[in-house]
Swiss-Prot record:
Protein name, entry field: Large ribosomal subunit protein eL34
Originating gene: rpl34e
A single Gene Ontology CC term: ribosome
A single MF term (Gene Ontology): structural constituent of ribosome
Pfam families according to UniProt: Ribosomal_L34e
């Protein structure tokens, strides 16, 4: 029976062979899903893939791109939005 901390859905089972040809189970943390654009759903470049604990240890400039809506929208959607706002202004 696994320990309660391993029964979570955030743990991933990894089967390993031990000496003597016995199979044992190791538990690993699952990787976080990649960041996606809020408007079109495209994958965002320059945004790290990791748990919140790992990302807080990074420098500010490593967490997301240094531009308008960096880390939330892809460059194409930002450009479309700015052009639309400029035309309606």
């Amino acid at each position: 029976m696994p320990a309660p901390r391993y029964k979570s859905g955030s743990s991933k089972k990894v089967y390993r062979k031990a000496p003597g040809n016995s199979s044992i189970v190791h538990y690993r943390r699952k990787k976080q899903s990649k960041a996606v654009c809020g408007a079109c759903g495209a994958l965002l470049n320059g945004v790290p893939r990791g748990r919140a604990v790992e990302i807080t240890k990074l420098a500010k400039t490593e967490k997301r791109p240094e531009r308008a809506f960096g880390g939330n929208l892809c460059p194409k959607c930002v450009k479309k939005m700015m052009v639309a706002k400029a035309r309606n202004f």
